[in-house]
Amino acid sequence: NEIKSMIDQFGIETVQAYMNHVQDNAEECIRNAITKLSEGKYEYELDNGEFIKVTIRIDKIKREATIDFTGTAEKNPFNYNAPMAVCHAVILYVFRTLVGNNIPLNEGCFKPLNIIIPNNSMINAKYPSAVIAGNTEVSQLTCNALFGALGVIAGSQATMNNFIWGR
């Protein structure tokens, strides 16, 4: 175990101090990126007429962002759902792309982000909801909605290269 060997060599206090520094650095990088953003909202319409809706509010004084998915479609009986962890991963990815520095992904990235994801929505689906499209289609649509709300969306083939099982 690499962490155990580092603790044995340097001591727990030193290892924890470096771990905290990595998280603090990531947090500061995200906060700096937030200061350059503008508030926005986006509604991504799905083929079935439902929406992934997101509003992003920026507090430039606190250097925090609120990402609010209120109004997003409820979970559906098909496989176009994702668990909340997928939504969190997408948020982490999007905000990480806005950072100009080379930082590792870690919990510090989330500290300046206030996330609101409605219960039982298609991006916070719980068992027994089908979620096979969650890691592909739904995650990409959520990503596009976030980039749209931030005003940095660019056209691409999105998930046109995927093969999906189920209905």
Question: Which sequence ranges carry the predicted segments?
Answer:
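Hydrophobic core positions in small helical hairpin nucleic-acid-binding modules
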Residues: 78-79, 83, 92-167
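Glycine- and acidic
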Residues: 4-17, 69-82, 125-132
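Flexible, glycine/threonine-enriched loop-and-boundary segments that flank and lead into catalytic domains
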Residues: 36-58
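Electropositive phosphate-/nucleotide-binding environments in soluble metabolic enzymes
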Residues: 20-28, 85-89, 136, 140
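N-terminal leader/propeptide and maturation segments of large enzyme subunits in energy/redox metabolism
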Residues: 1-29, 145, 150
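Short beta-strand elements
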Residues: 52-71
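Terminal presequence/propeptide segments associated with secretion/organelle targeting
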Residues: 8, 34-35, 72, 85-86, ...
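Phosphate/ATP-binding catalytic cores across multiple sugar-kinase/actin-like superfamilies
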Residues: 28-37
